[in-house]
């Protein structure tokens, strides 16, 4: 019996479905029993008093209708639903979630109308659960919960930093475009430190060639010498950068560089904390045995997955990452095979960048990747294939509590 059939069977055996449409201040609940009896949608506040009222309503219905099992489901939502979810974790219920995309599509089948209301949505969610199209809700606890929060925070800060760097790039392009060519961008510490002290061509000319060479060599710790200094000095003398409004531009450049420095420091603090919490995860050492997989990557994966023991097979965890394959074919038309991208996007991103490390020379997936390329697969698709294989490997090591052994089959045969 497949998993979907099992889920449908569970719902049909003296089970009550409670579906919730999560809101910012108020939630809408709905109850449906296995025998068809239902309690029409009702509102309850998103606070402790509202949670108690909701639970009392469920408990009364359970006693009246002699219910053996309660399934409470909601859409995969934002932070609004987290307090309610944590309140229900200690209750004798099964918590499940449904894909918002499924809700959007099924609601038209409900009454042949695209109408969306707070009273209609929980009924649609209940329908989806009754069809067996629900997923178990996995809530990280302890160190895993800390890692998820830290990893999400790190992603947001990196996104903000990227936006700042793009703004800085456009400003420098206006007043000193040649700098970007000679220094090959502004992301490096050398570029940022030099810009902080000498942001304009006039600043470099006033400093003088010899001093530019010394300053550049010191800032870059010997990476850039007098050859770069000469090119930079000549570029400053012949720069086509604008002069008008430069004072305002320099004020913004100073602010952005300070912000980038501050965010770099905060990212370092986050990563330090992530490494500390990773030590509290017993199976993390098995994942770190994979060459090319470092502590921050493992922390991010564990934070997104939670507990590997909650997943029964590799297929389930592949689906969580949105790396499960699908195609759209009809008649003689053969569709392209693609990944669904319906799982956790940060997990998928972490695996993709991890794949770039494990395909390097002497990496654990180097041969596998190049075999795919030699067989005509595009590089990006090959990296996605490596991501899938890497996640299956990580799942196996975590579940079996084993260290990675390169060329295991060859060594075991020796």
Predicted regions and their residues:
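A detector of single, family-specific signature residues
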Residues: 1-414
């Amino acid at each position: 019996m497949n998993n979907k059939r099992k889920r449908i069977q569970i719902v049909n055996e003296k089970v009550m479905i409670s579906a919730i449409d999560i809101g910012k201040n108020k939630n809408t609940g709905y109850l449906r029993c296995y025998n068809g009896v239902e309690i029409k949608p009702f509102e309850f506040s998103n606070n402790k008093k509202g949670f108690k009222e909701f639970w009392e309503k469920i408990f009364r219905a359970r006693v009246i209708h002699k219910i053996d099992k309660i399934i409470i489901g909601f859409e995969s939502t934002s932070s609004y639903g987290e307090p309610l979810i944590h309140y229900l974790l200690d209750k004798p219920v099964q918590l499940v979630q449904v894909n918002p995309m499924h809700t959007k599509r099924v609601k038209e089948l409900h009454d042949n109308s695209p109408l969306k209301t707070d009273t209609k949505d929980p009924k649609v969610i209940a329908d989806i659960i009754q069809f067996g199209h629900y997923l178990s809700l996995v809530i990280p606890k302890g160190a895993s919960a800390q890692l998820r929060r830290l990893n999400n925070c790190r992603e947001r800060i990196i996104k903000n930093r990227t936006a700042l760097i793009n703004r800085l790039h456009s400003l420098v392009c206006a007043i000193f475009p040649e700098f970007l060519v000679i220094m090959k961008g502004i992301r490096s510490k050398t570029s940022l430190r030099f810009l902080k002290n000498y942001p304009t061509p006039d600043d470099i000319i006033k400093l003088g060639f010899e001093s530019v060479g010394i300053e550049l060599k010191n800032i870059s710790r010997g990476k850039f010498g007098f050859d770069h200094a000469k090119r930079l000095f000549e570029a400053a003398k012949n720069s086509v950068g604008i002069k008008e409004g430069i004072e305002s531009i320099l004020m913004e450049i100073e602010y952005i560089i300070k912000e980038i420095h501050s965010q770099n420091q905060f990212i370092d603090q986050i990563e330090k904390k992530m490494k500390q919490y990773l030590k509290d995860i017993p199976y993390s050492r098995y994942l770190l045995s994979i060459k090319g997989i470092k502590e921050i990557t493992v922390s991010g994966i564990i934070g997104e997955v939670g507990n590997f023991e909650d997943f029964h097979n590799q297929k389930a965890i592949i689906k969580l990452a949105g790396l499960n394959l699908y195609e759209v074919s009809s008649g003689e038309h053969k569709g392209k095979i693609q990944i669904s991208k319906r799982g956790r996007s940060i997990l998928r991103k972490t695996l993709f960048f991890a794949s770039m490390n494990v395909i390097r020379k002497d990496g654990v997936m180097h041969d596998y990747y190049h075999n795919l390329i030699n067989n005509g697969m595009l590089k990006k698709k090959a990296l996605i294939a490596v991501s899938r294989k890497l996640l299956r490997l990580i799942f196996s090591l975590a579940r079996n509590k084993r260290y990675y052994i390169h060329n295991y089959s060859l060594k075991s045969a020796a």
